[in-house]
Design a protein with these regions (language model features):
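Conserved alpha-helical "signature site"
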Residues: 1-145, 149-157, 163-216
Length: 216
């Protein structure tokens, strides 16, 4: 039944969480101020806490003073990192696993994998890929497995799938790139990111021109 739903497109896409949407819309204004972004961030305590934690991490601090308020955190991290952190939080909000069981393990494994891919994508773009923005590569890494999150959450209604992990993995492999593309397009992300989400499993991908974010 789940395979039929996916194949005929009869599935409801999740809404883009409100705080991430407001951050993204504000950042579309090239003249947006740190104060305006800070006001949006402060409306979501979890996002505020996460930004403070990242700003005070060993990678970001580098001998600087401890960041104690959201405005300082935004100034240290930059707008793109704020956007990516809001998207990461949006994924956590949109795809909350149950407290226990195989679905939770699958979701948590996918979440850890997405973070690793995001970090590696950032490093590769910064060091190797001329023309690919590191922050865009990081965002794409965070989103590349979003279809997998969605299918896993739908699979909760079919508990027998978790008794046959090979069948579930087959569904995930076949459908998560296309479902992921549908979600990121519905959420209004750029075409380049949608293509990367759709084609990230195509290891022999070939195209004219320089490397793009899908190649990363």
């Amino acid at each position: 039944q789940l395979a039929r739903d996916l194949s005929d497109g009869s599935f409801e896409l999740p809404a883009f969480p409100d705080v991430a949407l407001r951050v993204r819309e504000a950042l579309n204004d090239a003249d947006v101020s740190v104060d305006k972004i800070a006001r949006i961030v402060l409306s979501e305590p979890v996002l505020s806490a996460r930004l403070l934690r990242i700003a005070n991490s060993a990678m970001m601090r580098r001998g600087s003073l401890e960041v104690t308020d959201v405005r300082m955190a935004i100034s240290r991290l930059g707008f793109e990192m704020v956007r990516n952190t809001a998207v990461s939080l949006a994924l956590d909000s949109a795809f909350k696993p149950p407290a226990h069981g195989p679905l939770r393990r699958q979701i948590e494994n996918t979440r850890r994998h997405s973070v690793r891919v995001a970090v590696l994508s950032y490093v590769l773009a910064k060091r190797l890929a001329d023309g690919v923005k590191p922050d865009e590569a990081m965002l794409t890494g965070l989103l590349h497995a979003i279809g997998r999150f969605y299918i896993l959450m739908r699979a909760e209604a079919f508990p027998e799938l978790f008794e046959h992990p090979d069948v579930l993995e087959g569904l995930l492999h076949d459908w998560h790139p296309g479902v992921g593309r549908a979600i990121v397009e519905a959420w209004g992300f750029p075409d380049g990111i949608a293509v990367a989400v759709d084609e990230h499993e195509v290891l022999d991908r070939d195209h004219a021109g320089r490397a793009d974010v899908a190649d990363i």
